[in-house]
Amino acid sequence: MPERRVFIIRHGERCDFAFGKSGLWINSFDSRGRYRPLDINLPRTLPKRADGWQGFAADTPLTEIGYLQSKLTGRALRDNGIEINHVFCSPALRCIQTTVGLLKGMGLDKRIQFSVEPGLYEWMVFARYARPCWIPPKDLKKLGYPVQENYVPCWTDKELRMNETLADFYQRSFGSINKILSECTEGNILIVAHGASLETCTRQLVGGDIRSTDDFYYLLQNTPYLSCVEVNSREGLWRLVGSPIPSFSHTYNRTFDPLQLVTKDLASLKREREGKDNMRTTQ
């Protein structure tokens, strides 16, 4: 039996996390929903969605840096000789856009379509008890995304439980990866999902037990954007072998206020900045 390889990657930098405290993301929309980015790192344009611009509050897009991260990671996969035959991703917009960036970086955006799998969505606890609303595959197709419109998912959005426990989330992830593997019996698979997915999609596949909540959160907090993990199989036995590409590291670049150059009371600005930084470290 030939070796099979599965690569699981976290999405790129998201707008709400990058700009949540500054307000620049939400304030880029006016009262009529017209969008004008207030920071160079905010996306220049946004896709139209049936639920209106308000839908971006719970289904955030990538930042410009997030999309660049995706393309650079795709290039790294290509440079390391990684071949991909099947692609699946979470229905979250940030995962959709990350998938597009990865395929572009690999030079596969004209050759491979990806399938949107709701079973790969993040733990429902993070949905904050509001059922998520995504852009449907048929609408993504109309917007130009290379989506397999006729794909039959393992899970539907209505099957995702709002009271999902951590054990339920592990089982959903494990069930999704098993269904994908049963349908794609040959070739290598790329899965683009969430930070926790690198753990929950592989843990039971390689014979591990569901982790404690504390251990789960530790791993989640130490899985940065575009992290990648590989599992491979010989004779039907799966093992985790690390990542086929190096880590993606860069520094945090804060918002610049040009008016500070003409402000006399820099002490008050310093206190305000330190307060914001302290809030950031506790989130």
UniProtKB/Swiss-Prot annotation:
One family name in Pfam for this protein: His_Phos_1
Active site, UniProt feature: 10-11, 194
Record's function text: Phosphatase that dephosphorylates some steroids such as ecdysone 22-phosphate (E22P), 3-epi-ecdysone 22-phosphate (E22P) and 3-epi-ecdysone 2-phosphate (E2P) in vitro. Also displays acid phosphatase activity towards 4-nitrophenyl phosphate (pNNP) in vitro. Has no activity towards 3-epi-ecdysone 3-phosphate (E3P) in vitro.
Subcellular location: Cytoplasm, Cytosol
Keywords: Cytoplasm, Hydrolase, Protein phosphatase
GO cellular component: cytosol
Activity profile over pH: Active at pH 4 and 7.4.
CDD domains the record matches: HP_PGM_like (cd07067)
Keyword hit for Manganese: no
Principal location: cytoplasm
Name under which the protein is recorded: Steroid-phosphate phosphatase
Enzyme Commission number, as recorded: 3.1.3.-
Broad EC category: hydrolase
Superkingdom as given in the UniProt entry: Eukaryota
Species per Swiss-Prot/TrEMBL record: Caenorhabditis elegans
One function term, GO molecular function aspect: acid phosphatase activity
